[in-house]
Amino acid sequence: MSRKTKRNQTTERPGPPVQQTPSPQGRDTRNVVIGAIAVLLLAVGAWALLHKGEDSQSSELAGTPRGAALASEHAPTLGEESAKVHIVEFLDPACETCAAFFPIAKQYMAENPGKIRLSVRHVAFHDGSEFAVRVLEASRKQDKYWQTLEALLASQHRWAPNHVAQPDLIVGAIAGVGLNIDQLMADINAPDVTQRIQQDLGDAMALKVTATPEYFVNGRPMPSFGEQQLRTLINDALADAY
């Protein structure tokens, strides 16, 4: 599924430069120094206010519709619960870009142990991918979710050629995970599996997620889609939190 471009990324303006004018010889330079200090203090104060607002954004989201849609207690989550940076990814297992981007979050987690947790939400936007989503949700009952997800993403080109999932090829793609396939097939239509799938889709609609992958980092979406935009969003969240 093709990505849709969002609003342009905004940039933070630097503080105003200090204007220094030459003084006649012998003039008291205290006013110049005081003026420079005042400008510096104003710049520091503005920076502090900005980042205070960023730090409080996640807690403020808790009482909003967007915060409710991003609540991921039911979702598979990787990382420490105490981590201050929370990445929520809306993912379609048949999405080629999802497979390409998934290692980015894992890389950041490896490089920042204990600081990041990742929650995955499923949306079946591609033809035939709902079966893959059900397999993923059912694999959680055997504590094999992350292994199943990585196996599906790694073999995606075989079971989802041209972004169209082939359900009959999916079971073969996860043969090496160690799942009890009979139990898996019995679980794919379980009520709790269906409920989680419906919740993810409803939350995606509430958040206006129309393409995958879509990321929210501490409640913030990417201003536009791209690898650098995602990295910037994660880097900023890490800098704010730690």
Describe each model-derived feature in a short phrase.
Residues 52-66:
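Ser/Thr/Pro/Gly-rich low-complexity linker/stalk segments immediately outside membranes or between
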Residues 72-76, 104-106, 201-203:
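A generic local structural motif
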Residues 68-70, 100, 196:
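Short secondary-structure boundary/capping elements
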Residues 54-55, 144, 157, 179, ...:
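Generic structural signal for secondary-structure transition and capping sites
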Residues 1-47, 172-242:
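C-terminal cap of thioredoxin/glutaredoxin-like
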Residues 83-94, 99-175, 205-210, 235-242:
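Structural alpha/beta surface segment adjacent to cysteine/selenocysteine redox centers
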Residues 80, 89, 224:
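Conserved strand-loop elements at the edges of beta-sheets that form or border functional pockets
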Residues 67-85, 110:
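A short beta-strand-turn-helix
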